[in-house]
């Protein structure tokens, strides 16, 4: 599996890198959380802008992200607007979503930018190119909160993300049975073995899928989300447990 090197953090090499989500509503609460996270044993912080009370104000977003970048010190910053269609807090029109992505790139504060595979649609390759021109790595994401598609479909979707130029394809799916968790893990291993052009980020959500968040080094998922107090998705495991298990399962 290849590696994405961002400011010395080698994503896709060795231990999965740990992401902490910020899902606060106000700028003050976001910055307070960022200051706390800057001291914790994690590699990256995700700002979920769809939770931000000022998500409709470009000026408020730009002001907050600039302060956030300073508060996080050396932590990587992943910026995400999770649309309502993909399990997020707010809905955006297609033009609004594209404008948000371009705003984040213009701030020159993000290390990684989440771009939703289905929301971006035909604009995805151009958006990836714009991000790369701005020196920002792309996490191309797809979320299914209802089911786990078959392995072949999961692999096909991640390969399409690779073909569009994404640095880190990301899939999150909901299991309905144990076999669904195995489908997700198997698709992850297949990507690592047969399509190693990029690292991938995968997870099976909910309590049933929690094991997938802890076994990334074994199966080939390069990053995992941990719960530092407030989860941003079902099944997130606490930071202390994540770090302990990742250390115990290190290859």
Which residues does each PLM region occupy?
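Catalytic alpha/beta core domains of metabolic enzymes, predominantly
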Residues: 112, 117-251
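Short beta-strand/loop segment at the start of cytosolic alpha/beta domains
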Residues: 1-7
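Short boundary motifs at domain starts and secondary-structure transition points
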Residues: 7-13
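Active-site beta->alpha loop and helix N-cap motifs at the rims of alpha/beta catalytic domains
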Residues: 3, 14-133, 143-148
């Amino acid at each position: 599996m290849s590696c994405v090197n961002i400011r010395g953090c080698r994503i896709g090499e060795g231990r999965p890198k740990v992401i902490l989500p910020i899902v606060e509503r106000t700028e003050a609460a976001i910055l307070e959380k960022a200051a706390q996270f800057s001291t914790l044993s994690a590699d990256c912080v995700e700002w979920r802008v769809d939770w931000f009370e000022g998500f409709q104000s470009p000026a408020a977003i730009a002001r907050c992200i600039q302060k956030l970048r300073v508060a996080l010190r050396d932590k990587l910053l992943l910026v995400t607007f999770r649309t309502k269609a993909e399990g997020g807090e707010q809905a955006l029109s297609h033009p609004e979503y594209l404008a948000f992505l371009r705003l984040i790139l213009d701030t020159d504060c993000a290390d990684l930018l989440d771009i939703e595979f289905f929301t971006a649609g035909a604009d995805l390759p151009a958006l990836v190119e714009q991000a790369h021109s701005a020196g920002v790595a792309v996490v191309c994401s797809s979320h299914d909160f209802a089911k786990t598609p078959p392995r072949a479909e999961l692999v096909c979707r991640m390969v399409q993300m690779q073909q569009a130029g994404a640095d880190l394809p990301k899939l999150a799916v909901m299991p309905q049975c144990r076999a669904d968790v195995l489908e997700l893990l198997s698709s992850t291993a297949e990507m690592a073995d047969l399509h190693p052009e990029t690292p991938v980020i995968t997870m099976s959500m909910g309590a049933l899928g929690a094991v997938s968040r802890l076994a990334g080094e074994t199966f080939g998922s390069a990053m995992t989300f941990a719960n530092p107090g407030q989860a941003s998705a079902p099944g997130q495991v606490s930071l202390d447990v994540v770090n302990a298990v990742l250390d115990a399962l290190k290859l």
